[in-house]
A protein has these predicted regions:
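Adenine nucleotide-associated cytosolic modules
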Residues: 1-385
Length: 385
C-alpha cells in the first residue's frame, strides 16, 4: 500500500532511503552551506544545517534512531528534512520484498527461520541475477506518485496479470518479449497467432528476438525458448499456465475484419466480457492502436464505427481494404515501445487512457500523435446485453 507524498508519519522502526536517481550537491553561498537535491523533473534546496550528513545516511540500512544519533541535528530540523524529501517524492520509507509467484517459499516458520539464518537468498545466484535485472524496472517505477517502497509491490503484482497476444507480425513478437521482460510473466501468444504448423518467415525477422537462421523453424517452439531467456520472473509450469488469472487482456495485432476467424474471435470476446486491445496493420506510413475495450462498459468497435460515420469520416472504408503489410524496423520498435509502456501503465492501475480511445501515428511526424476519444453509442447496444 503506497502513501501520498507529504503524508509521512515518521517512526523509529523504518529505515528510509533516497530513491534511485536522486542527486544532490552541496553549494556554499554567503551565509552557509546549502544542499540542492532533485531529479530529472525538479529540484529543491535544503537550508538546514547537517542536511548533507543526513542525505549521506539515507541508504536504507540505518534506522531513524541511528541517523538522529549520528547526524547530531535537532529533531525539528530532522523531521523537516524528511518531510520535504517525502513531499517531493525523493524518499522511500518502506522496504517491500519481491515475491515470486512461481518460486518455492516455505510457510513453515521453522523452515523459513532456518533459511533466513543460513542466508539462503544471499547465496542464490538466480535471485541475485533477478535483482540485477529488476534494478532498471524499479528505478523507473519508483518515480510514480505515491510509490514509497521503490516500486517492489507494483512489479510483483505484474505476475498476477495475464496477457494474450494474437498475431505474428514484428510488433506482436516485440510486444511478447517486452511484456515478459517487464515482469508480466503470464504473457503468451494466442492460438491464432501461434500455430503448430506455422514456420518463421522473413516477415518476422527484424523483431530483435528472431534471427535469419531461425527462418523455417517452428514459431511456437522458438517463442517458448525465447520466453525462458527474456522473462524477468520464472515462467509458470504447464499446470499453472492453465489457471486463468482474474486480471487479463487480449491484444490483437492486425486487421480484425480480414478473416472470419479473427472477426469471430472478437465477437466471442464481446459475448464473454473479455477485455481486449487492438493494434492495426500499417497503412501508408501510419498505424493506429486502440481502443482497449471492456465489453458492456466502454466503447466497442461498432460504437466507434457508428461515431465515425456520423462525423463524416470516410477514411474508415479504406482501412479494411488495405493489403497486409509489415512495419519498418524503426517503426516496429518505436510503436511496440509506446504501446507496451501504455499497457504496462494500465496493468499497474495508474492509467486508463487506452480505454475508449484510438491513437493514430505517422512515421513522418513522430512527435505528433493524434489521440481520439469515443463514448458508448446509443445505437450500438453493446452496453444493453
Amino acid at each position: 500500500m503506497t502513501q501520498n507524498p507529504g503524508s509521512l508519519h515518521t517512526s523509529d522502526s523504518y529505515s528510509p532511503r533516497l530513491k534511485a536517481g536522486v542527486r544532490y550537491c552541496a553549494i556554499f553561498p554567503e551565509g552557509g552551506e546549502r544542499v540542492v537535491i532533485g531529479n530529472f523533473d525538479h529540484s529543491v534546496e535544503l537550508h538546514q544545517s547537517g542536511a548533507r550528513t543526513i542525505l549521506e545516511m539515507l541508504t536504507g540500512t540505518k534506522s531513524i534512531d541511528e541517523i538522529k544519533a549520528q547526524a547530531g541535528i535537532c529533531e525539528v530540523e530532522f523531521d523537516s528534512i524528511l518531510t520535504t524529501l517525502h513531499t517531493h517524492n525523493f524518499l522511500d520509507v518502506r522496504q517491500s520484498k519481491i515475491v515470486l509467484a512461481n518460486r518455492f517459499h516455505s510457510n513453515v516458520p521453522a523452515i523459513a527461520a532456518k533459511a533466513k539464518k543460513r542466508k539462503v537468498e544471499e547465496r542464490d545466484p538466480a535471485l541475485q541475477l533477478l535483482q540485477n535485472r529488476l534494478s532498471p524496472e524499479l528505478s523507473e517505477i519508483t518515480w510514480r506518485e505515491g510509490i514509497d517502497d521503490g516500486g517492489v509491490e507494483v512489479i510483483s503484482a505484474r505476475q498476477d496479470f495475464e496477457i494474450e497476444i494474437f498475431g505474428n507480425s514484428r510488433i506482436a513478437v516485440l510486444l511478447y518479449g517486452i511484456f515478459l521482460g517487464s515482469g508480466v510473466t503470464n504473457t503468451s501468444m494466442g492460438t491464432q497467432g501461434i500455430r503448430d504448423n506455422h514456420a518463421i518467415s522473413h516477415r518476422e525477422i527484424g523483431s530483435t528476438y528472431l534471427r535469419t537462421s531461425d527462418v523455417g523453424s517452428s514459431f511456437s517452439v522458438k517463442l517458448s525458448e525465447l520466453a525462458k531467456d527474456f522473462a524477468l520472473f520464472p515462467i509458470p509450469s504447464d499446470r499453472k499456465k492453465s489457471e486463468k488469472k482474474e486480471k487479463s487482456l487480449r491484444i490483437y495485432v492486425g486487421d480484425p475484419t480480414k478473416e472470419d476467424l479473427s472477426t469471430g474471435m472478437i465477437s466471442q470476446w464481446m459475448r464473454n466480457r473479455l477485455d481486449f486491445f487492438l493494434v492495426s496493420t500499417p497503412q501508408g506510413g501510419g498505424i493506429s492502436w486502440g481502443p482497449l475495450v471492456k465489453p458492456g462498459k466502454t466503447p466497442c468497435l461498432r460504437c466507434i464505427q457508428i461515431s465515425r460515420i456520423e462525423q463524416g469520416d470516410i477514411s474508415q472504408y479504406l482501412e479494411n481494404s488495405a493489403d497486409q503489410m509489415e512495419s519498418s524496423i524503426a517503426t516496429s520498435h518505436e510503436i511496440s515501445g509506446r504501446i507496451a509502456q501504455e499497457i504496462l501503465n494500465y496493468v499497474d492501475g495508474i492509467d486508463q487512457s487506452l480505454v475508449g480511445s484510438r491513437t493514430r501515428f505517422h512515421s513522418g511526424s513522430t512527435c505528433n500523435r493524434e489521440h481520439i476519444s469515443y463514448a458508448l453509442h446509443p445505437r450500438c447496444g453493446c452496453a444493453w446485453v
